[in-house]
């Protein structure tokens, strides 16, 4: 899909928010929101943010005003009591809804969907989700949909994921390009852990018309775009460069 967004000069750019959860427990979670604001130099920027729970209630809020230096994100920190943790069994999703004011005038609104969860990979011990050791029960899932072709079809993707869920699958490795946002959003909602990748060749060819032709020019940009695009999606656990 291609979308043309029209904004005020002072705005949140595409992929302009980063949400992290530095502390996660059953009692409370800390949520850190960093918001990029374009063209904000020498202006008083006010950001009003509400954290909305999976059942639609406002569970935390902040209203802050400050001047932002060029390239510096606007940071806000929240505490969420008794958080609903994201996992494949409980894919609960929160929203951070922000209103951006410049010199007292509303110029942009931006909503980021996210999950509260912790992940950790420990040498010789493995992967931990929300403090609990876990093994991936996963598949490698190519982007095409059989006779339907490669164009995104949300209903077909949902059917595919439902069948995988029914057989006990809880993880998906995509291949071999940046996955469609519709797939990642469905994995957020339905409870799949993901390992995503931007390309399947480096500068050594596997075929005549492969990614190696574009690696030097595009590899870093594609990797950065993939990580920025999906850094707030709770289903995305690992980003990798295929070898």
Language model: regions and residue ranges:
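Solvent-exposed loop/turn segments at secondary-structure junctions
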Residues: 178-180, 200-203
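Active-site groove signature of glycoside hydrolases
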Residues: 223-240
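Conserved radical SAM core fold
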Residues: 142-147, 201-207
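Active-site-adjacent "subsite" loops/lids of carbohydrate-active enzymes
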Residues: 137, 203-221
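Secreted/periplasmic carbohydrate-active enzymes, especially glycoside hydrolases
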Residues: 1-186, 190-194, 237-238
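Alpha-helical scaffolding within the catalytic cores
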Residues: 121-125, 180-184, 214-228
